[in-house]
UniProtKB/Swiss-Prot annotation:
Protein's name according to its UniProt entry: Dual specificity mitogen-activated protein kinase kinase mek-1
Chain positions found as Phosphoserine: 221, 225
Disrupted-gene phenotype: Loss of kgb-1 activation. Hypersensitivity to high concentrations of copper (> 50 microM) and cadmium (>5 microM) and to food starvation which is characterized by a failure for most animals to reach adulthood. The few surviving adults appear starved and are defective in egg laying and are infertile. In addition, have moderate susceptibility to pathogenic bacteria infection characterized by a shorter lifespan and a substantial decrease in pmk-1 phosphorylation. In absence of stress, animals have no obvious phenotype.
Keywords carried by this UniProt record: ATP-binding, Kinase, Magnesium, Metal-binding, Nucleotide-binding, Phosphoprotein, Serine/threonine-protein kinase, Stress response, Transferase, Tyrosine-protein kinase
Gene from which the chain derives: mek-1
Tissues of expression: Expressed in pharyngeal muscles, uterine endothelial cells, intestine and in neurons of ring ganglia, ventral ganglion and ganglia around anus. Expressed also in hypodermis and body muscles.
Alphabetized CDD domains for the sequence: PKc_MKK7 (cd06618)
GO cellular component annotations of the record: cytoplasm
Protein kinase domain mapped to chain residues: 72-325
Consequence when changing residue 225 to A: Abolishes phosphorylation by mlk-1
C-alpha cells in the first residue's frame, strides 16, 4: 500500500502534544505573522529539542514506558512516499505501523514532521484519529509508532475497482466529520489535506483520519497559508491567484465533498492534466451526484459541500445535523463485513 506523505509548514508556538504526557488544555495562540527563515530555523530547533525530551516512550494499554528502538522488530513493508516509509513492526506482542521520516537541515520539512507529531499526540483522546503510541527521534530520522490500519481509501478504490456503497460512505462521513470537528473545536486546528489517501480503514470496520503534517493552526478561526495541501482537493478560494484572503474550515468541507464524490463514483470527478483539473475547479460548475443513483439526502449533502462560495458551505456543526449524517450515525452498518467481502472478491 503506497502512502502519500504530504508534509507542510507547522504552526509557531509550543508543542502541545509533544511536551510530555498528553494534555487537555489548549495550546497558546501563534503570532499572526510569517516568521523569517532565520527565526523559523531557530523555532524548529527549539521545538525539536522539546520533542527529543519525550522520544523513546511508548504508551500501550494505558501504560507509558521507556522503550528501546532495538526492540522494534520489522515485519514487512507497508508503503513509501517521497518523504518517508511505513513499515509494519512488532513491539513485544503489539503490532504497529512505524512511519520513518529522515531528519534534514531543511527547517520547512522538519516543521512538517513536528506538526504531524504534535497533532497526532494531541489527539490521543479522539477515536476518529489514528492513534499514536509514541515516537523515536535519532540523529538520522524520526519514527512515529501508530496503530496499524488495513488500508487507505485511495488504495482500496484501486484494488476493488468499484465505487464504495452509499451505506458505507454514510459511516465514513460520520467518522471524518467528527474527526475534523474535534480538531477544530478542541485544538483550533484545520487539517487542510482531506482526501481518500488520508482516510484509513481497519479490518474491524473502524474509520480514522491521518496525516497532519500540513495541518494549520487557526487564528480567529481562519488559516492564512495557501500553499499547503493537495491542489486537486482544494476549494476554488484557495486556488484563485487573485484571492488574497484567508480561509476557514469550509475549505476542508469542499475537500470532503470532492472525496465523497470520488468514493461514490469510484473516480476523481475532474479529468485531464493537473493544470486542466485545477482550471475546472476554478471555472466549471462543481461536481454533483446522479440523483437516479443516490439518495436525495446524499445528493444534497454533496451539493452543500461543493458550493463555489465558501460562505454557502456548511460548517461541521451543520454537517453533523445533516439528515444523511444523522441517519447513518443512528443505523447499524456492518462495515467490517463489507470490507472483508470486497477484499475477498479481489483476492
Amino acid at each position: 500500500m503506497e502512502r502519500d506523505f504530504d508534509l507542510g509548514m507547522g504552526r509557531p508556538g509550543g508543542l502541545g502534544g509533544l511536551g510530555g504526557e498528553p494534555i487537555m488544555q489548549q495550546m497558546p495562540q501563534p503570532a499572526p505573522h510569517h516568521p523569517s527563515r532565520s527565526s523559523n530555523d531557530h523555532n524548529v530547533k527549539n521545538l525539536m529539542k522539546q520533542a527529543e525530551e519525550n522520544s523513546g516512550y511508548l504508551t500501550l494499554q494505558g501504560n507509558r514506558r521507556k522503550a528501546d528502538l532495538k526492540e522494534l522488530q520489522f515485519v514487512e513493508d507497508i508503503g513509501h512516499g517521497s518523504c518517508g516509509t511505513v513499515t509494519k513492526c512488532r513491539y513485544k506482542s503489539v503490532i504497529m505501523a512505524v512511519k520513518t521520516m529522515p531528519r534534514t537541515s531543511n527547517s520547512y520539512e522538519m516543521s512538517r514532521i513536528l506538526m504531524d507529531l504534535d497533532v497526532i499526540c494531541l489527539s490521543f483522546d479522539c477515536p476518529y484519529i489514528v492513534r499514536c503510541f509514541g515516537y523515536f527521534i535519532t540523529n538520522f530520522d524520526v519514527r512515529v509508532c501508530m496503530e496499524c490500519m488495513a488500508t487507505c481509501l485511495d488504495r482500496l478504490l484501486i484494488r476493488i475497482k468499484q465505487p464504495i456503497p452509499e451505506r458505507i460512505i454514510g459511516k465514513l462521513s460520520v467518522s471524518i466529520i467528527k474527526a475534523l470537528h474535534y480538531l477544530k473545536t478542541k485544538h483550533q486546528i484545520m487539517h487542510r489535506d482531506v482526501k481518500p489517501s488520508n482516510i484509513l480503514l481497519d479490518w474491524s470496520g473502524v474509520i480514522k483520519l491521518c496525516d497532519f503534517g500540513i495541518a494549520g493552526r487557526l487564528i480567529e478561526s481562519r488559516a492564512h497559508s495557501k500553499q499547503a495541501g493537495c491542489p486537486l482537493y482544494m476549494g476554488p478560494e484557495r486556488l484563485d491567484p487573485n484571492n488574497f484572503d484567508s480561509y476557514d474550515i469550509r475549505s476542508d468541507v469542499w475537500s470532503f465533498g470532492v472525496t465523497l464524490v470520488e468514493l461514490a463514483t469510484g473516480q476523481y470527478p475532474y479529468a485531464g492534466t493537473e493544470f486542466d483539473m485545477m482550471s475546472k475547479i476554478l471555472n466549471d460548475e462543481p461536481p454533483r451526484l446522479d440523483p437516479a443513483k443516490f439518495s436525495p439526502d446524499f445528493c444534497q449533502l454533496v451539493e452543500s459541500c461543493l458550493q463555489r462560495d465558501p460562505t454557502m458551505r456548511p460548517n461541521y456543526d451543520m454537517l453533523l445535523q445533516h439528515p444523511f449524517v444523522v441517519h447513518h450515525e443512528k443505523i447499524e452498518t456492518d462495515v467490517e463485513e463489507w470490507f472483508a467481502d470486497v477484499m475477498g472478491e479481489c483476492g
